[in-house]
Amino acid sequence: MVNDASSISRSGYTQNPRLAEAAFEGVRKNTDFLKAADKAFKDVVATKAGDLKAGTKSGESAINTVGLKPPTDAAREKLSSEGQLTLLLGKLMTLLGDVSLSQLESRLAVWQAMIESQKEMGIQVSKEFQTALGEAQEATDLYEASIKKTDTAKSVYDAAAKKLTQAQNKLQSLDPADPGYAQAEAAVEQAGKEATEAKEALDKATDATVKAGTDAKAKAEKADNILTKFQGTANAASQNQVSQGEQDNLSNVARLTMLMAMFIEIVGKNTEESLQNDLALFNALQEGRQAEMEKKSAEFQEETRKAEETNRIMGCIGKVLGALLTIVSVVAAVFTGGASLALAAVGLAVMVADEIVKAATGVSFIQQALNPIMEHVLKPLMELIGKAITKALEGLGVDKKTAEMAGSIVGAIVAAIAMVAVIVVVAVVGKGAAAKLGNALSKMMGETIKKLVPNVLKQLAQNGSKLFTQGMQRITSGLGNVGSKMGLQTNALSKELVGNTLNKVALGMEVTNTAAQSAGGVAEGVFIKNASEALADFMLARFAMDQIQQWLKQSVEIFGENQKVTAELQKAMSSAVQQNADASRFILRQSRA
């Protein structure tokens, strides 16, 4: 159809003024273009037929005609539908010599159908745009509501984090032995649970906001695309709808951009405050662990000092008993005619050799030799007595650690004295008699222990510092009663009996020395155990410090990830603004054209 305009200059009516006059006269007289075209066609045909009868040549011209130029594209776009139809009819006039009226009617019908199709398409696109615009509006409202929910969740999380920090500080200021420590610990646990729930709610709200923002952006872009497509329609009514929708869409894009900027600000602020809260919490935990490590370090040093002091004291006691043993052996030599000198020499040699070997290797062979007795006899007896005393002391209100220490020491002493009594009985009475007296000895020791333990507990509760002195007196008295009941007391003894008795006393002192050393080892072991527990707590606190450092590192990494999310949101907002600007420039160019 565009090239049809160029055919005007080639048509025959420009060379025949009567043909042109007949065509234009018919168009001017009738407003019905189809009828006018039909009449013009008939007039043209009649005129042309008359010319043929008159013998007029097509190349002849009675008057000079002015060459006309076809209208420009800009002029055609400014024409109304009636003007465009007039232009079309004018073009059709140039083809009347080559086409028939039926062809003209067919082309007019096609043109009218095309116009109606464009109109229907414009209306359909307008409906789609209105639907997309409504969806974009709903998505934008949902995005705004999600931002408000995120802000509320953030406020709840900040309050929970603050409450947790306060509870942690309160817990760190208390000692585990304080009455309110358990309540403070429960408050910390509850605050931690609330903070975790608030954090999860905040994360869910943030994710929902991100999804809502993405959905709102996609629907706004969909509306923009439909608007761009809608601008191609030629219907005037549709153009008015497009203009109104364009204004609404531009306002929605601006609103969406503002909401995205608000969300980016909230996310950035939340990320910074979350990192600050985590740092404050980790600093509080770190300070508490440092204080605990210092406390456990002091306890470890104190328990180690006690163990060393106990070891030194028991070493002195061993040396004193060893010296007394040597003296008793020498004195016994006077009554035995030197027979016990060998025992004294052996005892002295054994004592010196044991000290030398212990100094060189750190191991006492006397202690190693007595280990089976310690494991199968003394240790069970000490544990039985120690547990009984510990339970009784705890019943009187003594703390567990002090009760265990006192029970271990008293149990070791009573077991050692019991072993001395057994050895003396075996040496004096004989193995057979000792075997027969085993049951009686067990019963007597049981009665003695039953009498001894309440007295020890009573003295511990009443006199405190006089406990061990009076306890030893009662133990000695009890053992004297045991000897009396077993018939060990005699009249005046001969020299040989005195010497033998002194030798037995020396043997008992040696066993007592070993038992005392073992009791000292038990006490030292208690202190070493306490030191080990303090060291274990110290290592646990150190591990907690390492874990806190790991948590701090994870918080920094999370902060970096949140910053990436913020950057992506800023990029999306910039893209939306850029698309809006491009659409605005396109609309401006179209309006100028």
Swiss-Prot record:
User: Which chain positions lie within coiled-coil regions?
Assistant: 151-208, 287-314
Q: What does this protein do?
A: Component of the type III secretion system 1 (SPI-1 T3SS), also called injectisome, which is used to inject bacterial effector proteins into eukaryotic host cells. SipB/SctE1 and SipC/SctB are inserted into the host membrane where they form a pore and allow the translocation of effector proteins into the cytosol of target cells.
Oligomeric state and partners? The core secretion machinery of the T3SS is composed of approximately 20 different proteins, including cytoplasmic components, a base, an export apparatus and a needle. This subunit is involved in the formation of a pore, called the translocon, in host membrane.
Q: Where are the transmembrane segments?
A: 330-350, 409-429
Query: In which broad location class does this protein mainly occur, judging by the first location in its UniProt entry?
Result: secreted
- Lineage, opening ranks: Bacteria, Pseudomonadati, Pseudomonadota, Gammaproteobacteria, Enterobacterales
User: What InterPro entries does the record tag this protein with?
Assistant: BipB-like_C (IPR006972), IpaB/BipB/SctE_N (IPR032391), T3SS_SctE/BipB (IPR003895)
Q: Which family does it belong to?
A: Belongs to the SctE/SipB/YopB family.
Membrane topology term = Multi-pass membrane protein
Query: What keyword terms does UniProt attach to this protein?
Result: Coiled coil, Host membrane, Membrane, Secreted, Transmembrane, Transmembrane helix, Virulence
List the subcellular locations. Answer: Secreted; Host membrane; Host cell
Carries keyword Metal-binding?
A: no
Identify the GO cellular component terms for this protein. extracellular region; host cell; host cell membrane; membrane
Keyword Signal carried by entry = no
Q: Which Pfam families match?
A: SseC, T3SSipB
**Gene3D superfamilies, from UniProt?**
Nucleotidyltransferases domain 2
Its source organism is Salmonella typhi
What's the protein here called? SPI-1 type 3 secretion system translocon protein SctE
